[in-house]
Amino acid sequence: MPTMQRVAITGSTGLIGNALVGHLKSEGYTVQRLVRRPSRSAEEITWDPQAGTVDLEALAGVDAIIHLAGAGVGDKRWTKKYKSEILNSRLLGTTTIANAVNAVKPSVFISASAIGWYGETGNRAVIESDRAGEDFLAAVCREWEGAADLVKDVRTVKIRTGLVLDPTGGALGRMLPLFRFGLGGKLGSGKQWWSWITLHDQIRAIVFALESKIEGPMNLTSPNPVTNQEFTAGLARALHRPALFPAPAIALKIALGGFSTEILGSKKVLPQALMDAGFVFDYPHIAPALAALVD
């Protein structure tokens, strides 16, 4: 049985949250989902990030709180209104949860962040100690992590997540239909670095953070980032299809607006904190990872 018996999670219906809930339950944890409506069972706890409230009585006695909730950065076009939603959903939600953590004092608080923290890195590899970038998502991440830093006297881990790979969602889920029909190719120049991690290793790394002594920022990426050209060529090989249809940068900018900077931008991020703590990836290299994911 796990040493931490009871875990509360926000964002439990997302790609990562849903997989994490299933894994934790299979490992013997009691999992409670934070929901934005009246709770329907003991497995649910009501919270309202807009109002800044959490049912603290229901949350009392929890061993760990994992905060994953936030508006998806790739879900909608980056209008001024949606950019505000991206920021505010993280700032209000994390501030609310941080205050709840300070009230109930679990053993550990794990708060989502992203490798967007680093901004554009070009060909330069970055680790957790590197400073934040200057673009929109870097600014979001600074405020997001700043809200998590409101927590005092509780071990806190800020998980800077990279490109999470799973065939059921995220970037890979969107790319697969085109690549299965042989219509895929590199995006833009293809020279931009993609710092990726399988959903499988993402979940393992979060559980590692839960059960170990690690704290502070933690990059959740493979130790072997690849260029977009390497990624798309590898995906085509895994599917036994050609990759003959590149998407020009201008087309992506027209189709995706501001979010295109995340597709075309370069982030070469290494998981130094995880490696220093002894975490071992099941899928450290892209070729076997993609082969397993599309099998």
Question: What spans do the regions from the language model cover?
Answer:
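NAD(P)H-binding glycine-rich loop region in Rossmannoid oxidoreductase-like domains
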Residues: S39, E43-G93
